[in-house]
UniProtKB/Swiss-Prot annotation:
Record organism: Arabidopsis thaliana (Mouse-ear cress)
Annotated gene: CESA3
Protein residues bound to Mn(2+): 521, 545
Post-translational modification as stated in the protein's UniProt record: Palmitoylated, in part by PAT24/TIP1.
Family: Belongs to the glycosyltransferase 2 family. Plant cellulose synthase subfamily.
Membrane-side (Extracellular) residue stretches: 282-283, 864-874, 932-961, 1015-1023
Membrane topology: Multi-pass membrane protein
Identification of the protein by name: Cellulose synthase A catalytic subunit 3 [UDP-forming]
PANTHER family (alphabetical): X-BOX TRANSCRIPTION FACTOR-RELATED
Pfam family, one: zf-UDP
Length: 1065
């Protein structure tokens, strides 16, 4: 394969005039309406985005004739351009991305000119501000991001706490900048693998000592070598323009039969329901009516679940291309910064060792250290969490360099040392075995120290906890304490064992006071959003539960292949990764892996508008969390024949064009979607002119009304590429960080309604993702071969049912709220099938009511010797058989294209029944009570520990046994019904066996689906709870009375009537 440099001078044939020869897109038009011509020498067809990329980051010359590109009208200037008059017109604004940053500088100026000695409070604005004294927040050039030399590396900022005392907070807020290349990519018509292989071969060929001879003495060989070097550089530049990801459709041989069977099943279902409705059972009308209503609901539920899986897709990422574009070796990394959130509440339910492993895997992630910041939210204000995080930061100084030196996976020490694999595979350093043994010993000592802290925390002293310096712990009262921030690690705040910097690690506990609504996890996440925006302001945010560690150290790079893609990234609100779990037995009795949902449902949604947000393992675009809409894609339309004949000018005023775009977007925006967006802010300030201070003041006041009373935070929301202002000091930033986590900060703002995690449901993840999709954003589903994250699944039936109960309760809350997808957001840009998926997500708990009734029908039919269908005819047999065959065919073809095993699919079907008749049923009634009567149900956190001897063990057991009663009752009812039916058939003769088989099949269908529940009930700690025994005895007594009433052993043969025959009959 020839390189680009070798073929550059050859004439290229078969060139389509209107097609870009780099990216195969349309060349497009100039602002004057003429065809865009990048090179005026050879007119080689190149589109404007590729032209701009070549000028900015390429070789700045035409690919065919090698003539240097001239600066065209509307193009930004680059170093080396000659002075050309008439080019700096209004078109330049189109490519002037840092315009937003100028506004943010002005916004911050109002805050910083108030004086350094003032306390945090209501913002005060000066009447006049000089332009010459406005502090610079950022600039067009790359800045170092370092604070002034007078700033200390670590300093103490105090916050007033109860009793008038002051609490020290360690701080290290130096932040490196980050730039994002937003130009489109091209050259997508050459295979990546072949080109890289060719480049490597040339690298090996040209490797050798560099000669110092003069150019005149080297001859033609050296000229060829220099040409090869230029060709290699051109090859790398070409690869950097390639797309960072690719969407791969399911092969038609697998997806088309699946779609055909779905349509066939829909037709059969309609014919089946028509038969059921038109053929009632006269002697069992009530049973028939109940069964038909249940079947109609099941059909509706199946439609809502099935059709969002119509367009499943796979995705591939190219990490090498990402590195070539943003992270080249020997150059400063241009990868975007990522703020990682870890949330925890109760360290006794969520063991500190589990949280520590999650934090260690984050600190050791394969990403530039100055681009990673880890924020740990302790919403329980536990001193145990604080001290264990301090121990974790010390152990990280040894663990992180060990991971990066030997490239180990996973980078959570507990799971790395517990993995039963050949840890010597692919390891070539002779020191690895010795270092691994030493590190394992270090980790065991670290575990002992954490266990000692846990043991100490079990006995709280009467006077409360006291810190090492003798001061009381501010969080002794978990419902009344100040905000706390502690920076453990960071730039210039401590190095690892080899002298390298470590990612920033920050402990955060938001302020809580009586009388303020805290909104549980959603409120804690929003507090982290504000703190991180003030201290580091990474443009992307990764959200992890405390028990979900990073299993793939390149997970962040996988997400950046979508979020930093110039074409796709601007439209993406988040990248969702599937949840994978450790510690599950191979049988997976309770469908803990949830493979059907993660490998089938979410892949189907990825082909529509993207997967739903599942609460963890998700990388967010910070702009989307702020409630902004995505940029509108401008579709270039060809001019009509009439406009050409009229000869009208196609050059439009830029302001009129903006108004037109706003009107166009307004037609697709829901009335509840925020009216603020970056374009409106820019236009308002730009229209009045930078000299109009009144307009600037009004813009800031409107933003502070939306985001809260913090000028520093408001300014950070306008910085598209993130970062902190170089002029700010660590003292001011930490003081502002304490302010934004105060309990009253969100009052009279849009937090929780339009910004951040949305309030109103215990499952805040569904609402948050739904609001983003309703605004027009799309999400991406990323499934790398090595799972990105792994977590701890519930290990027993009790934890699993309580977890499902919480999810279902959140769905019921959304169903009865104003954000219900059945009626919310129809003026927005939510796609139809995506709405189907969200509707199914909210109404699925309601299915528990018809499911419970339908599972009870077999036993009732067996007891009463009636059935839900009339005598089966040949036509009815065909409909029943066709329906069952279509159900099995759909499942088989679904497993075929998704790769899900039949055992996983069957376990999912079983747990759908188990959860439906237990947790979902309770969630419906508790949700109705909460919405209508205001009776709130408090849920404890799902335990991640192996034992259950906590303070809430009795309450936990009571809740578990309450969920146990409905499925236990169903099992007993159907088992007794089977015995009663068989006994009746034995005493009724041969003719009663035929109808009995249909009833028995119906009953066994219920029993088989509940079998894992029965097995779990009998196997829980080798004992059955007392209340379950009492209920079982009670139910057995009830059905014993029914048995006597039925009296199956009494002869059913009747003789002649004595009244008719007389005595001599």
């Amino acid at each position: 394969m020839e390189s680009e440099g070798e073929t550059a001078g050859k004439p290229m044939k078969n060139i389509v005039p209107q097609t870009c020869q780099i990216c195969s897109d349309n060349v497009g038009k100039t602002v004057d309406g003429d065809r865009f011509v990048a090179c005026d020498i050879c007119s080689f067809p190149v589109c404007r985005p590729c032209y701009e990329y070549e000028r900015k980051d390429g070789n700045q010359s035409c690919p065919q004739c090698k003539t240097r590109y001239k600066r065209l009208k509307g193009s930004p200037a680059i170093p080396g351009d000659k002075d050309e008059d008439g080019l700096a017109d209004e078109g330049t604004v189109e490519f002037n991305y840092p315009q937003k940053e100028k506004i943010s500088e002005r916004m911050l100026g109002w805050h910083l000119t108030r004086g350094k000695g003032e306390e945090m409070g209501e913002p005060q604005y000066d009447k006049e501000v000089s332009h010459n004294h406005l502090p610079r927040l950022t600039s067009r050039q790359d800045t170092s991001g370092e604070f002034s030399a007078a700033s200390p590396e670590r300093l103490s900022v105090s916050s007033t706490i109860a009793g008038g005392k002051r609490l020290p907070y360690s701080s290290d807020v130096n932040q490196s900048p980050n730039r994002r290349i937003v130009d489109p990519v091209g050259l997508g018509n050459v295979a990546w693998k072949e080109r890289v292989d060719g480049w490597k071969m040339k690298q090996e060929k040209n490797t050798g000592p560099v000669s110092t001879q003069a150019a005149s003495e080297r001859g033609g060989v050296d000229i060829d070598a220099s040409t090869d070097i230029l060709a290699d550089e051109a090859l790398l530049n070409d690869e950097a323009r390639q797309p960072l990801s690719r969407k791969v459709s399911i092969p038609s041989s697998r997806i088309n039969p699946y779609r055909m069977v779905i349509m066939l099943r829909l037709v059969i279902l309609c014919l089946f329901l028509h038969y059921r409705i038109t053929n009632p059972v006269p002697n069992a009308f009530a049973l028939w009516l109940v069964s038909v209503i249940c079947e109609i609901w099941f059909a509706l539920s199946w439609i809502l679940d099935q059709f969002p899986k119509w367009f499943p897709v796979n995705r591939e990422t190219y990490l090498d291309r990402l590195a070539l574009r943003y992270d080249r070796e020997g150059e400063p990394s241009q990868l975007a910064a990522v703020d990682i959130f870890v949330s925890t509440v109760d360290p006794l339910k969520e063991p500190p060792l589990v949280t520590a492993n999650t934090v260690l895997s984050i600190l050791a992630v394969d990403y530039p250290v100055d681009k990673v910041s880890c924020y740990v939210s302790d919403d329980g204000a536990a001193m145990l969490s604080f001290e264990s995080l301090a121990e974790t930061s010390e152990f990280a100084r040894k663990w992180v360099p060990f991971c990066k030196k030997y490239s180990i996976e996973p980078r959570a020490p507990e799971w790395y040392f517990a993995a039963k694999i050949d840890y010597l595979k692919d390891k070539v350093q002779t020191s690895f075995v010795k270092d691994r043994r030493a590190m394992k010993r270090e980790y065991e000592e670290f575990k002992i120290r954490i266990n000692a802290l846990v043991s100490k925390a079990l006995k709280c002293p009467e006077e409360g906890w006291v810190m090492q310096d003798g001061t009381p712990w501010p969080g002794n009262n978990t419902r009344d304490h100040p905000g706390m921030i502690q920076v453990f690690l960071g730039q210039n705040g401590g190095l690892d064992a080899e002298g390298n910097e470590l990612p920033r690690l920050v402990y955060v506990s938001r302020e809580k006071r009586p009388g303020f609504q805290h909104h549980k996890k959603a409120g804690a996440m929003n507090a982290l959003v504000r703190v991180s925006a003030v201290l580091t302001n990474g443009p992307f945010i990764l959200n992890l539960d405390c028990d979900h560690y990073i299993n793939n150290s390149k997970a962040l790079r996988e997400a950046m292949c979508f979020l930093m893609d110039p074409n796709l990234g601007k439209q993406v609100c988040y990248v969702q990764f599937p949840q994978r779990f450790d510690g599950i037995d191979k049988n997976d009795r309770y469908a803990n892996r949830n493979t059907v949902f993660f490998d089938i449902n979410l892949r189907g949604l990825d082909g529509i508008q993207g997967p739903v947000y599942v609460g963890t393992g998700c990388v967010f675009n910070r702009t989307a969390l702020y409630g902004y809409e995505p940029p509108i894609k401008v579709k270039h339309k060809k001019p009509s024949l009439l406009s050409k004949l009229c000869g009208g000018s196609r050059k439009k005023n830029s302001k009129a064009k903006k108004e037109s775009d706003k009107k166009k977007s307004g037609r697709h925006t829901d009335s509840t979607v925020p009216v603020f967006n970056l374009d409106d802010i820019e236009e308002g300030v730009e229209g009045a002119g930078f000299d109009d201070e009144k307009a600037l003041l009004m813009s800031q006041m409107s933003l502070e009304k939306r985001f809260g009373q913090s000028a520093v935070f408001v300014a950070s929301t306008l910085m598209e590429n993130g970062g902190v202002p170089p002029s700010a000091t660590p003292e001011n930033l930490l003081k502002e960080a304490i302010h934004v986590i105060s309990c009253g900060y969100e009052d009279k703002s849009d937090w929780g309604m339009e910004i951040g995690w949305i309030y109103g449901s215990v499952t805040e993840d569904i609402l948050t993702g739904f609001k983003m999709h309703a605004r027009g954003w799309r999400s991406i589903y990323c499934m790398p071969k090595l799972p990105a994250f792994k977590g701890s699944a519930p290990i027993n039936l009790s934890d699993r049912l309580n977890q499902v109960l919480r999810w279902a309760l959140g769905s019921v809350e959304i169903l009865f709220s104003r954000h219900c997808p059945i009626w919310y957001g129809y003026n927005g840009r939510l796609k139809f099938l995506e709405r189907f998926a969200y509707v199914n997500t909210t109404i699925y708990p309601i299915t528990s009511i018809p499911l419970l009734m339908y599972c009870t029908l077999p036993a009732v039919c067996l007891f009463t010797n009636q059935f839900i269908i009339p005598q089966i005819s040949n036509i009815a047999s065909i409909w029943f058989l066709s329906l069952f065959l279509s159900i099995f065919a759909t499942g088989i073809l679904e497993m075929r294209w998704s790769g899900v095993g039949i055992d996983e699919w069957w376990r999912n079907e079983q747990f759908w029944v188990i959860g439906g008749v237990s947790a979902h049923l309770f969630a419906v009634f508790q949700g109705i009570l909460k919405v209508l009567a205001g009776i709130d149900t408090n849920f404890t956190v799902t335990s991640k520990a192996s034992d259950e001897d906590g303070d809430f063990a009795e309450l936990y057991l009571f809740k578990w046994t309450t969920l146990l009663i409905p499925p236990t009752t169903l099992l007993i009812v159907n088992l007794v019904g089977v015995v009663a039916g068989v006994s009746y058939a034995i005493n009724s003769g041969y003719q009663s066996w035929g109808p009995l088989f249909g009833k028995l099949f119906f009953a066994f269908w219920v029993i088989v689906h509940l079998y894992p529940f029965l097995k779990g009930l009998m196997g829980r700690q080798n004992r059955t709870p007392t209340i379950v025994v009492v209920w079982s005895v009670l139910l057995a007594s009830i059905f014993s009375l029914l048995w006597v009433r039925i009296d199956p052993f009494t002869s059913r043969v009747t003789g002649p009537d004595i009244l008719e025959c007389g005595i001599n009959c």
